[in-house]
Amino acid sequence: MRTMNHDLQGLLSDLKGGHRLGEDEALMLFETRGRDIWTIAAAADERREAVAGDPVTYVRNQNINVTNLCVNACGFCGFSKKPGDDGIYYHSREEIQQKAALAKSRGVSEICTVSGLHPHFTAESYIEIYRWITEAAPGIHLHASNPMEVAYGAERSGMTTREVLTGMKAAGLSSMCGTAAEILVDPVRDTICRGKIPTDEWVRIIREAHSLGIPTTATIMYGHCETEADRVRHLAILRAIQDETHGFTEFVPLSFIHMNTPIYRQGLARAGATGREDLLMVAVARLFLDNFRNIQVSWVKEGIKMAQLGLIAGANDLGGTMYEESISKGAGATNTDYLDPAEMQRVAEDLGRMLERRTTLYDMC
């Protein structure tokens, strides 16, 4: 019987020859321990260089979280509030437009907005907010909503999700967030986000968005109660969608922030992913998602030092400047508000690479 190291060498050699990684093979990579993780990271970095080149990219963006009031009770969330809780906010039209105008004055090219599911929101609420933003910041790329918000708006308004997406696009939606994916395995979803749309509904709405010319990101939230096999299944679902639609702009792994979350306090989740897992998530994703050009590391979730390591394990993008971020902060993250491009450049140059500013759709600025 071949040793694990021999198996790994053979598999990585096959990948260089054009072999497409299978789910069982991806699972083997996720289960790797010891110095072999560096071998996987190096192979992923070579793939990154071949697919995306050497530049480390970023987008100048600003986040707007409109409200933290939410009808859902996702176990992984430390951001949402219920009626009567302390600290509830809902930004007015004036406040939202002030934030959008500020973003425009900062030279931001993208405004990103995803919020709680406000009990009074309808599809028209989202559409109206998008009009406010694009009115205050004309020409901005609005990266907003996600399949859960689309489904919620449709249900509240008696509309189809296709009608909601069409209305959002007409109001200025340029691309959609691929969040609310978490782990696309329903038994896991029942534990961490009971009440959210099931896997097949998330997939359907993503495909629908792509069919309407609305590109989306793709995400995974890992490091809680899922297994390595669950992670592989999730990646396989994303790869199959991309084979069909080519509508994903990037893959963004989101490491679970545990500190202030119900599932951690209740003993249903562990204390987040380890550094080994963070590194392998980027590397295995680069090797498995062979139809994705761009893989991002989240400095918000992992901190800048771990994010830098991800850039030599298959990632090519550092995400955005953000300016403000409430969801990860609510869960206990400390690196959430703003990352200066000068610091991004220092990180990139430390690896012998150059920083390049991009648009949301990865055109270079």
Curated annotation (Swiss-Prot):
Entry-linked InterPro entries: Aldolase_TIM, CofH/MnqC-like_C, CofH_family, Elp3/MiaA/NifB-like_rSAM, F420, FO_synthase_su2, rSAM
GO molecular function: 4 iron, 4 sulfur cluster binding; 5-amino-6-(D-ribitylamino)uracil--L-tyrosine 4-hydroxyphenyl transferase activity; 7,8-didemethyl-8-hydroxy-5-deazariboflavin synthase activity; iron ion binding
Gene3D superfamilies: Aldolase class I
Cofactor binding comment, as recorded: Binds 1 [4Fe-4S] cluster. The cluster is coordinated with 3 cysteines and an exchangeable S-adenosyl-L-methionine.
Cofactor(s) the protein needs: [4Fe-4S] cluster
Top EC group: transferase
Subunit organization: Consists of two subunits, CofG and CofH.
UniProt function note: Catalyzes the radical-mediated synthesis of 5-amino-5-(4-hydroxybenzyl)-6-(D-ribitylimino)-5,6-dihydrouracil from 5-amino-6-(D-ribitylamino)uracil and L-tyrosine.
Protein family according to the UniProt entry: Belongs to the radical SAM superfamily. CofH family.
Protein name: 5-amino-6-(D-ribitylamino)uracil--L-tyrosine 4-hydroxyphenyl transferase
GN (gene name): cofH
